[in-house]
């Protein structure tokens, strides 16, 4: 990952993510590289370029969260429904000092449904109230 001056702060990891996912990641700041748009173009994720300024909202208010089983180390996925379903991949920097947005792309509704059914994604409610 680049030096810190090439990064933009986009949010914070919340303890609520740990609670829903049953993990224990350290609650660190989340950054994105200034080069993320170029990465998205290179990976042909054009559809999500219009959502790049929504990253703080996706982090603060995801509809679904999960763990990518294909990634080693600390890596989570956040999905937010807009006109398109937008997935953010967030990883722990190798130095372990911060989290960063590793990828961003759209996912089809059928894929979201399959991942919910398999347990890879879990519904996330920010203001969930406990019922008595």
Task: Give the residues covered by each predicted segment.
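Ribonuclease/tRNase effector modules and their secretory precursors
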Residues: 1-132
